Structures are given as C-alpha cells and as structure tokens.
Amino acid sequence: MLAANERPEAPTAIRIDLGAIFVSLELSRSKWLITSLSPGGGEKMSKHAVAADDIAGLLARFAELKRKARARTGRYFPTIVIQEAGLDGFWIHRVLQAEGIESHVVDPAPIPTSRRRRRAKTDKIDGETLVRALLAYKRGEPRVCAMLRVPTPEEEDRRRISRERKALTNERVRHVNRIKGLLFSQGVSGYQPLRRDRRTRLEELRTGDGRPLPTHLKAQVGRELDRLELLIGQIKAVEVERDAMLAAAPVGSAHFADCEQPAPAMLLALKGIGPEFAAVLWSEGLSRHFDNRRQVAAYAGLAPTPWQSGSVDHDQGVSKAGNPRLRTTLIQGAWLWLRHQPHSALSLWFKQRGKQNDGRLKKKKTIVALACKLLVALWKYVNAGVVIEGAVMKTP
C-alpha cells in the first residue's frame, strides 16, 4: 500500500475556455428543451423549456444567455445552435440564420451513444449529448457527428413533385388491389380497374355462380372506382407539373463550363432514362454538390460497410444510410439500363461478372453494384460532361 505522501494526486478538473455559447434544441410537439453551456459558468449545463413554435421565447432565452455570459466575463459571445433533423424540417434553422445565429442540423444516427442493451434515454440526456457533439465538432474532431447540408427552400420544394407522385401511385395500387379483392371473393377474376372501359365492364360482370353482382358490393366497387379515377387525374396533373419543372430547369444546373443544356435535359437525352427517373435523380441527388464519388455513393446509401476485427474481415453490404428514394430509383434504373443500353460498358461489366460466377449470377448483389456505378457515371456526366462509355443517345 502506498504511503499517504506517495499516493497520486486527485485528478483535477479540465479547464474549458469557451469562445461561444453552445446550445442544443430538443424539439417536441409540446415544448422545446434548450440545453446550453456558457462561458464563465463552469462545466454545468443549464436547461430551460419554451413552448413549441414559440420563436419569440426562444430568441428571448438566447438573449438572456448572452446577457448572463457578458455579466460573468465582461465579453460578448456569439451563440451556436445544434438540433437534430426530424419532423420539424428546416424552418427553425432558417429562422435562426436569418437572426444571425450560427445554426447546425445534425443527423442523429451517427452520434455516439451507450451500447448497453438497456440505456437511459431522456430529453435532458439527449440535449447534453448534442452539446458535447457540437463542442467536438467545433474543435475539429473527425467523424464525431454528421452535419447536414440544409437544402434551400427551392431545392426542398422541388422534391415534392416526385414524392407526391410516389405517394399517389402507392395509393392507386391499394385501391386497385381492394377492387380486385372484393370481386375475387365473388368468383370474379380478370377485371382490370385501370382500363378505360372499367365502368362498362363492371356492368357486365357476373359472379362465379352466374349471378349479377350484389347491389351493395357493386355500389362499393363504384365508389372505389370514383376514388381511383380521382387519383388517376391527380397523377396526370403531377406529371404535367413534373415535365414543366424539368423543362424550366436553368442551364446552370449542369455544373461544368460551356454546358448548353440543363442537367435534366442531359439525363433525358440518354436512352433508357425517362421523365420520372430523371426527375428523381436530379431533385433527390444530382442537383447537390459532391466533392468525390465516395460522397455520391454514400449519399445514396450505396457505400460499402466493412467489418474488420482481428482475423475477421468481411463486407456487410451497402450501408443503406442514405436517401432511400434515390436508392430505390437507382436499383430500378439499373435494370432498365441493362435493357436499353446492352452494349454500354456498364452492361458489359454486369454480364462479365455473371460469367465469372459460372453463370450463377448473384443478381441482387451485382445489380446493387451496377446501380452504384451508374450513379457515379451519371454524376460525372452531369457535372463534367463525361459521356458514359458505349451509351446510346435517344434519336431526335
């Protein structure tokens, strides 16, 4: 045992010299929890709550934090705010920026948390965790969190068209399946609700035992057709709006010099790429700025996820941590690319991988790899004008 005079000294507190007031916002439908760490206040974080959507109360609390920090230190400090991306969108971030406050929106998934099976989870703990993540980010520590690049209101609104069309088509599928299910219970099959003569054919239908359709069932199917026709009209209206958006895209949307065409027009010029594919690619992905192809693949969730520990070294597949709409569209577009661009370098690579597997083509994994390669190739095509090797353009 060590003597009293030989015992190590007790650890001293780490001195923190803050150059700003660091604030995190925990947003909910009823209240906003403000967690702050101010200069001159030690290591203890203060917490205050304001009613949800009370911007005036939020700004008043920020002003009070500045006043107290100035009273303690005699200096003026800026405010730096962090919040998680969620249901509230980006309007609070834009309000804070308009007030001259530095604001950050963070992806909550990569923030380090306890790996215990049952861990404590409260707004207080989450607020303190966000403040610590913000401190580490401002110190320049790598991979401590993932800050989002907040889209402009125009970029955010541009995505609405393709997303609304997807929601409408999903709803259309539900109505079609419901109509077919109602009729199948009466022994009727082969009825196509999407055909133009759907009303006429409904009047001619007979049950499996030769009876006319029951009165109430026929009325229910008629009301389902009313909803289906409303959806069909709305989908057509959205598609017209989508085509107008693609046609009105500025020439500068292609990011390289001497480009006389906007990015959507360049995409539509390739055989196998239609208006919907081009709209999703442009609005969800290619309209953004990326520094390299790794960022492109990571944004779509198509980046590899390695697992290395000791002698274990294998790949877990793609991360799926990116934009799910873009990733789904790319998988579908990869199959269309094989059909319409069979002699391109990408399609030949896909076929060569099949031969290497002795004909037992692992299509699911290979088509995902092709989708990643296709996205990178289209990004280079739109941003640098690099034409995809062997790609065929549409005939005018």
UniProtKB/Swiss-Prot annotation:
UniProt KW keywords: DNA recombination, DNA-binding, Plasmid, Transposable element, Transposition
GO biological process: DNA transposition
Molecular functions per Gene Ontology: DNA binding; transposase activity
Pfam families registered for this protein in UniProt: DEDD_Tnp_IS110, Transposase_20
Transmembrane domains' residue ranges: none
DNA-binding as UniProt keyword: yes
UniProt record similarity statement: Belongs to the transposase 20 family.
Official protein name in the record: Putative transposase y4rJ
Organism: Sinorhizobium fredii (strain NBRC 101917 / NGR234)
